[in-house]
């Protein structure tokens, strides 16, 4: 964990000394000859862009995009210049239908959300090229579950956006008396019509933030 993670460090640095994390690092080192996404220096970008103190919203993904050049260390986000992935296109469609200020920016780079305190967290932080879930069950899930637990225990009035069955399982880590849990189907083309479209999670997030005297999220993205 050499990447700068700012004020997350006191909370997350102890993880480095745990057996599961050492096993994870050994696994990653054993895969050094394979193409791993995102690039090593961006594995912890979600924490770099969204400080612990600023985090107000968590959008949980599963694992990074496995296509070349797509993953950049933020769930659902891709660098400018990359084609917008289908799930993110559907997120944009929902934003466009929701009661928030949003215009499709023509790119999939979500840094603007992250820097407002939207933690764009994948449950697994690495993947191998063209091999989805190739780094599942190696220890990342233990680490990111601990992230959710730390947020749950040390903060109040967070919003957790859990899309799809995988993300919804994480609700057991969250105290719904302290935080708002918004669950829906996954925005992928296979399931978006089963409850993601029309969920209005973005306006519901801001309504909750307003009610708890927090700054609203500007969901619009720079063109």
Question: Where are the regions a protein language model picked out?
Answer:
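A polyanion-binding, active-site-adjacent surface
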Residues: 7, 14-162, 166-169, 174-175, ...
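C-terminal substrate-binding/active-site "lid" region of AdoMet-derived donor-dependent transferases
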Residues: 196, 201
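Short, extreme N-terminal leader segments that mark the start of a protein/domain
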Residues: 1-10
């Amino acid at each position: 964990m050499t990447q700068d993670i700012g004020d997350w460090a006191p909370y997350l640095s102890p993880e480095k000394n745990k057996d599961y994390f050492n096993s994870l690092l050994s696994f990653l080192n054993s895969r050094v000859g394979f193409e791993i996404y995102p690039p090593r220096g961006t594995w912890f970008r979600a924490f770099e862009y969204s400080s612990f103190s600023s985090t107000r919203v968590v959008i949980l993904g599963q694992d990074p995009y496995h296509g070349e050049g797509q993953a950049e260390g933020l769930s659902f986000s891709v660098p400018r210049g990359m084609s917008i992935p289908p799930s993110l296109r559907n997120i944009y469609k929902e934003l466009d239908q929701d009661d928030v200020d949003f215009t499709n920016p023509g790119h999939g780079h979500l840094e603007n959300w992250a820097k407002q305190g939207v933690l764009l967290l994948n449950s697994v932080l690495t993947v191998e090229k063209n091999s989805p879930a190739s780094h599942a069950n190696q220890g990342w899930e233990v680490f990111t579950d601990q992230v959710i637990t730390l947020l749950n225990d040390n903060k109040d009035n967070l919003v957790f956006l859990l899309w799809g069955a995988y993300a919804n399982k994480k609700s057991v880590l969250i105290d719904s008396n302290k935080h708002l849990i918004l669950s829906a189907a996954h925005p992928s083309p296979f399931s978006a019509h089963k409850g993601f479209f029309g969920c209005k999670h973005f306006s519901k997030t801001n309504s909750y933030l307003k009610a708890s005297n927090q700054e609203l999220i500007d969901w619009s993205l720079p063109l």
